[in-house]
From Swiss-Prot:
Domain notes: Fusion peptide 1 (FP1) and fusion peptide 2 (FP2) function cooperatively and have a membrane-ordering effect on lipid headgroups and shallow hydrophobic regions of target bilayers. They are considered as two domains of an extended, bipartite FP. The membrane-ordering activity is calcium-dependent and also dependent on correct folding, which is maintained by an internal disulfide bond in FP2.
Chain spans, region Heptad repeat 1: 1006-1056
Matches recorded under InterPro entries: bCoV_S1_N, BETA_CORONA_SPIKE, CoV_S1_C, S2_sf_CoV, Spike_N_sf, Spike_S1_NTD_MHV-like, Spike_S1_RBD_bCoV, Spike_S1_RBD_sf_bCoV
Cellular component GO terms held in the UniProt record: host cell endoplasmic reticulum-Golgi intermediate compartment membrane; host cell plasma membrane; membrane; viral envelope; virion membrane
Gene this chain is encoded by: S
Origin: domain of life: Viruses
Chief site of localization: virion
Record bears the keyword Lipoprotein: yes
Subunit structure: Homotrimer; each monomer consists of a S1 and a S2 subunit. The resulting peplomers protrude from the virus surface as spikes.
UniProt xrefs under Pfam families: bCoV_S1_N, bCoV_S1_RBD, CoV_S1_C, CoV_S2, CoV_S2_C
BetaCoV S1-CTD domain ranges (all copies): 327-605
Protein's recorded name: Spike glycoprotein
Amino acid sequence: MLFVFLTLLPSCLGYIGDFRCINLVNTRISNARAPSVSTEVVDVSKGLGTYYVLDRVYLNATLLLTGYYPVDGSMYRNMALMGTNTLSLNWFEPPFLSEFNDGIYAKVKNLKASLPIGSASYFPTIIIGSNFVNTSYTVVLEPYNGIIMASICQYTICQLPHTDCKPNTGGNTLIGFWHTDLRPPVCILKRNFTFNVNAEWLYFHFYQQGGTFYAYYADVSSATTFLFSSYIGAVLTQYFVLPYMCSPTTSGVSSPQYWVTPLVKRQYLFNFNQKGIITSAVDCASSYTSEIKCKTQSMNPNTGVYDLSGYTVQPVGLVYRRVRNLPDCKIEEWLAANTVPSPLNWERKTFQNCNFNLSSLLRFVQAESLSCSNIDASKVYGMCFGSISIDKFAIPNSRRVDLQLGKSGLLQSFNYKIDTRATSCQLYYSLAQDNVTVINHNPSSWNRRYGFNDVATFHSGEHDVAYAEACFTVGASYCPCAKPSTVYSCVTGKPKSANCPTGTSNRECNVQASGFKSKCDCTCNPSPLTTYDPRCLQARSMLGVGDHCEGLGILEDKCGGSNICNCSADAFVGWAMDSCLSNARCHIFSNLMLNGINSGTTCSTDFQLPNTEVVTGVCVKYDLYGSTGQGVFKEVKADYYNSWQNLLYDVNGNLNGFRDIVTNKTYLLRSCYSGRVSAAYHQDAPEPALLYRNLKCDYVFNNNISREETPLNYFDSYLGCVINADNSTEQSVDACDLRMGSGLCVNYSIAHRARRSVSTGYKLTTFEPFTVSIVNDSVESVGGLYEMQIPTNFTIASHQEFIQTRSPKVTIDCAAFVCGDYTACRQQLVDYGSFCDNINAILGEVNNLIDTMQLQVASALIQGVTLSSRLADGISGQIDDINFSPLLGCLGSDCSEGTKAAQGRSAIEDVLFDKVKLSDVGFVESYNNCTGGQEVRDLLCVQSFNGIKVLPPVLSESQISGYTAGATASAMFPPWSAAAGVPFALSVQYRINGLGVTMNVLSENQKMIASSFNNAIGAIQEGFDATNSALAKIQSVVNANAEALNNLLNQLSNRFGAISASLQEILSRLDALEAQAQIDRLINGRLTALNAYVSKQLSDMTLIKVSAAQAIEKVNECVKSQSPRINFCGNGNHILSLVQNAPYGLYFIHFSYVPTSFTTVNVSPGLCISGDRGLAPKAGYFVQDHGEWKFTGSNYYYPESITDKNSVVMSSCAVNYTKAPEVFLNTSITNLPDFKEELDKWFKNQTSIVPDLSFDIGKLNVTFLDLSYEMNRIQDAIKNLNESYINLKEIGTYEMYVKWPWYVWLLIGLAGVAVCVLLFFICCCTGCGSCCFKKCGNCCDEYGGRQAGIVIHNISSHED
């Protein structure tokens, strides 16, 4: 059992293996050989590589945990080296100097059984750190005589260790000098641990998280247990294993083995037994089988098809680009310069288009710490930036705490402000005192204008640091000197004086008489640091980011001179000084501001790689000038890159394009495929069959998608690439445990796997669970048979809906609401404490809730919803989602009968066009429907009204121009152009006809108006008569009531005559306490009302919140998609919805189809085939159609055959019935005690004194009403109305009979002739001719013609 020694070894003992730090140089002829890679892979199935997090255990549990674990199946590297005389001095460089990143897992060989004579360590020592100098912490785990010495100290690790194999030791007999620190280093942990010295292998788990280092240990190949942890506060970036002793010369001595594999943050599935021991573990991302186990949280998943979500194509290569041959930034030279400024005059330098090595920079300046803001410090290594701006200054020892982020001490308030919002790193380092001098300088221009001198004021040593304790700003006209003529007469308090520079004003001084002496009272006395004189023009100021202190304070009494204003050296105040030295080193602060992260050509070369070729068409990782990610490159021809531009971004800030400065080619960058993998897993199979949906196998293997290294077989199907299954789609099965969809099934057979050596046992077959004939031949209903109505026909319906999503904000002045301007009430309201504040706080929360809801609604609308309208054809504008053509009306050629144009114009057109109203007797509307807005159809749309052709009498400008042009042309060139005047003439005649028929209708209307108005006058007369009668009755009743009231008051005065006297006595006895009680009652009442109002506001806001959530839901489900819910988006089955902003809410227009007719069918919840297999419908019903079972959808009756596409196969035909619980609301009312008993309980022996009330009848003024004057006025008004009777004149009308056209008379004559000829022949042929001729003889003698004419009857006008 591992335990900790309480005693520590002496700190001077720093033994690591057999190494000593002696200045003897080994050779650099050859590099150290590369670490060997193990043939053994990491197998985590038994818990290897895992750890008990802080020794926590779980009993009989299987759960998912996320931590730092190795990748299952990864390789080990042996990081151990054998120390020899010829060991290369490059042994501590990569690859043996390795990245620590998240952590490492180590498997270490215990060499105790074959330990060389004299050796005290059983395995090599591991060192984990960043720069391995005494300015940062280093973790060392050193074995020594059966213990492990763990330490975390600020070591300076020896980089050139020397072994005992070297014969020349230089006379140095000291053993154990493995670091070069001359004095004991600063440590945060030094502890000793025992370990099982008899174990063959030792296992270590090292990782870092949030600045804390964790170490775990085990002596068996299972989960490790907690060893120690310590907060370091910095990122450990590298590690190496010290070479182990000389090459053994004794036979049987083993070589050291230190097998290491990296850790990454991964999710593992653990199984804990009844003792809390990890018995098995699964790396969830290592294989598809592992992912299935983690998905089901079971070590033995059930047989089934699992969709593996979050699947992404794995990159197959790396595209790396850096600008080569850039100069070195030489940042370390500037940081280590022999002069450094003070905080008062901090310096900045910007580095751009150059490279730097951060690791060597930190070693060069012997960095104490490096911490970053808004970026992980470990990520700065190897990144690129647009530029790096660095500020630096020496740190006064007493003010070091001021530089912590978030502090507001003197340094950050008045000297240098750190921008916590910027991406920056804070570097603390030190230089030897002999190599640096502090430059103290005051950059203030207005201080220097009045005589400030750095040497005279600061007179500091080489390592003294000046800093400001306060900063002051002044105006352009400021001058600290008093005016000589003003202070000349002063005897006491007389300051120095001098003339001020041009454009400035002297210090303000007032001369005051004090006895026989005059006294000067001047501004800013005694010091601007302590004065509160508002006349003092030196104003304190705080620093902004990037600002220097504007100036130190000035003791104005010490400013003067014989001519020009000048201040003495000791006149400047508000600064202090301290040394920067500690341990003979000057400590310096530097702020590195990283501009343009992952873009630009200012790069760290710590992990720089050689440039690679750009591979197109496959998924690759990329690192383009520090911008990292993965994607697919496609070469394109692009001319939109500027000369300074290499990367192209989209509107979301994602990398979209890349210009290669090496080849000058341009590329388009697309993301790697992220899709869906279905895994068909069988419990008896070692691995699943895989279906990469919608992907060809070539793409799968070219992009290294599959995590299976060597699949046995694969092929393309119409569902995608199938891996680890045989293609047997020509076979069909009627039972399937692994259904892939679309009628395909993966069938697993152990026998099939055994028969074929290259088979996994999986086959992709066709799944046919049943046929239509089987269903109808051997089927019975499951769960009963029911009648149901299913729609067969629909109609489209529109439904408008308003949903309130916000309300006006309310704020209340509580004091004004309760008390108004009454002072006593306001004073007493203070006793109610924070009631008013609580009211306003609640209303503030309500208003904030309104803002939050409005933001949520706006977010839902912004994402994919357009509120602008669809404009009608002929109007320019963007075509969007909502049609507002009913609002705009009908414009252009699309207008036809029945459209909006025929029904009227819209409100918008009323504004855009002049409007002319016509009297329409029935033909104007028909004319508009015919033209449809096309004026050229004017004569083609002539209307007929009672046999007369008519047109509307109003012409547009274009029609007038056209007809005028035609008439002019007909007059200019007769007779050839005479036809051009015909349209004009017809138009005029038809419009005159239209005016004539309109006048007749107007005449009839006049008659109706006159009759109606005369009837109204008569009704008004009757009304006034009734009013006059009613007023007379009112007068009599009021007077009678007044007389009765007078009698009543006379009677009451005898009984209540003492009322006024009693009230006066009561008022005189009210004291302040009683008055306050009355005020208190009023305040309570009003506060109760206010509280009720606020409660109602909260209640209403709850309803609005619910409706706003419903509005968001309807935007997402109705507007952005088609809702499957019935009657949710309108009434019926949803088609589409439109949304528009409305006052305090949203206005929805839903379109849906509503059933208009139904059919009644027999429906069964399920069917049973052959008594053993059940069928259930998918999104529909099983119905009987002409004796056969069919499937139909639930929304529309359309019977079709039952197949596996519309049904679900069940293992049995059993039906489970569940009885619904009978739960009723409690409607009983609690019995209350008798009201009188409860009243008597609280009010006993209560008496009231009846006051003596008297009443003075003389003070009551009883008035009798006399309404005769008002009634006379009404009677006069009736008389005037009678005299204003209107006698309307009737407009005359004309009746016009139109002569029939000549061709009508011609047809009548021809018909008569034909009749006569027919009669003649009939008479001749029948023997009746003699009779006919006799009778017609006389007719022939009197034959004559008659002409019909036009008769016009004139009805003269007359008066009624």
